[in-house]
């Protein structure tokens, strides 16, 4: 990327100025709302905590004569003396600083994007590299098969309310407008910013009730509306122009980027997602898709004023208008008269009318009327083909490639359904439903008594049979009926919205091939699959979700067994010879640590690639990544480029969760940048990484070193996880028990029937708790032991070579380094000394020792004196953030201490205390830009 140091310096200066500006405005707001005393208290606490950090780190920059212990004692004494209302205002002030500085940072990122030359973007770089290294034909092949799918999930990691996020976005919009200091424009802008900050201060940042899945769907739609109408069409237009320079075309109806959603389809562990809820959310998505389409059509109507009095139009287009007018007798006669010689406007008016009718039909659950509404997205897109052909044939090719193509590509991406809905359910629920159906037949052996192999054989034979297990609708017992009902709901949804509304059914906790066949048999019962009739069909596909290390290691055997079954192989053929497999990053990390999880997932991708090739199918990998490194997070571009060779064939799916969505997609420019990154990485990986970047010898040597690292890291991690006192330590040293009160998401934080302990705790609250207490164990623990083991085995030179030559290894180490930089053992020690019983302190010593070892090993590997030396701007940013983050952590400890004292006394916890405690949780999340 061509980007000068001078530009970076200017941008950094602008960012610092913006942060100072909004901080000053926040201070003025605090004085307006509460008088000068609150602002004075904020500064007193900030300076004290800053001094304690400096003293703890050696005192080189300390400004006072006190030891770290003395300063911490002062902070504790001050905070313990604060009345509850004052403590609440104090923590809100620090939390609001992060909301405002985060907004300033987003504006800074947007400015950085705008300073780049037009030809210096990620897509321009990808197109140029592919055309230059592989040739235009390879580039065309990649474009033809490009299918990138970000999947929005409702995973509860966004701690901020939409009401707050909306105001933050509004503040970002105002801040982004350039004004000169001392001008009237700057004064007006400051007035606007001050007004927004006052509004934010008087807005409750905590949710009073837990959101429903429908609420979560509305939140996702909020972001999708902007992405699908602004960021994506413009980006695809630019991509089309870049490709044209190399003689490559982006087909007019192509949809290289499509969004999906789990919201309303993810049933695993969420009893609130019922068939009725799924139906309601699909209808909500359709209403928004129709509304967006109509708005886009209105834009085209205003543009396409081409007149037949000056230029002609294709007869096929004119004939279609005649047919439309016959089918739509209720159109406004005045519009028809005004546009009598403007066929494109007439056609678009008819398309708009049919879209309105489509929305009404779906809302009323009535039947499709051919010619009056649309049954499928392809039917709608075919109308644009008529418009395009006529424009090209009558000297308006630029219009066809411009305004028309922009709208056509947008509608091709979201269709009548807005986002494709994945359905996910736990494997055990399918076996329960199948078992009830089978046992009604009076078989010799009860279904529940069958081994996995026996179940696979039985289910394979059942899938091959045309005889259903039940010839008529029946009601099953318990949760089985709800499971069975979902498949019937999918069939109805496909009939109502078309084949793109639901494409994939995900089986979580897949441990064997029989788990996938059980879901397929239920789909067959619901009429979604018919493999051997005169018109065979498979209306949905099935994706095993591999979540634990054991499942990842068995991945090749599971998929090989599946594809070896003739009936299932026929099902995959009917789905275009694509087998989707989802890889779960969160649970494998929680179970085995970050290094082993990442390595096992990397190896799994290689194995799945080879199994798919053996059976003549393509594997589409679905990466279930969270926002934090402890749940597979990290830069998207690096993650995609770090995949093994031959894995990418233009197709990929990945989850976008919680706070990641607001961070990546809240501003149109940021949304575009993230979409560009994803598309560019998939294009480059598909075209230029078909063969290994390293030799056979290198790959073998690197793999051997990784096994050494992984084994040692895993052993060290399990030493901590298997410690019988860890659950007590985790609950004592973190605010994880307060997570449920935050009302972040509709899904419970523990798996149903999971009992006590950490085993049933989901990965999100697991990472959440460690992050809040600044220990962030899931993002690095064990890595130091792993690297040390490799070094002591004589692999130091190999490690340095791997950093230089192997994208995967370099990406993992980079993510671990970032997490270590956000980890703070001084603050974590304050949590432990204040909240954790003495007999559990040994666990903190174990964590701190591994932290120090990991930092030392990372610095040895990178050649840095300190973490992030190679990224000084980021390093400085985190140091500045600590000045405002540390006070929130100290306040959290104090408030958590008060909460627990009230719990021990048996009294009811003061609602104001609980509220203040939860605000600290929001504040730490905003400060670290991570929850779980």
From Swiss-Prot:
Keywords tagged on the record: Carbon dioxide fixation, Lyase, Magnesium
Cofactor: Mg(2+)
GO-annotated biological processes: carbon fixation; oxaloacetate metabolic process; tricarboxylic acid cycle
CC terms in the record's Gene Ontology section: cytosol
Classification via Pfam families: PEPcase
Catalysed reactions, as listed in the record: oxaloacetate + phosphate = phosphoenolpyruvate + hydrogencarbonate
Active site residues according to the UniProt entry: 155, 590
InterPro entries per the UniProt record, alphabetical: PEP_COase (IPR021135), PEP_COase_bac/pln-type (IPR022805), PEP_COase_Lys_AS (IPR018129), Pyrv/PenolPyrv_kinase-like_dom (IPR015813)
Any one GO molecular function term: phosphoenolpyruvate carboxylase activity
Ranges in coiled-coil conformation: none
EC code(s) of this entry: 4.1.1.31
Family the entry assigns: Belongs to the PEPCase type 1 family.
NCBIfam families on file: PRK00009.1
The protein's role, per its UniProt record: Forms oxaloacetate, a four-carbon dicarboxylic acid source for the tricarboxylic acid cycle.
Protein name per UniProt: Phosphoenolpyruvate carboxylase
Protein's gene: ppc
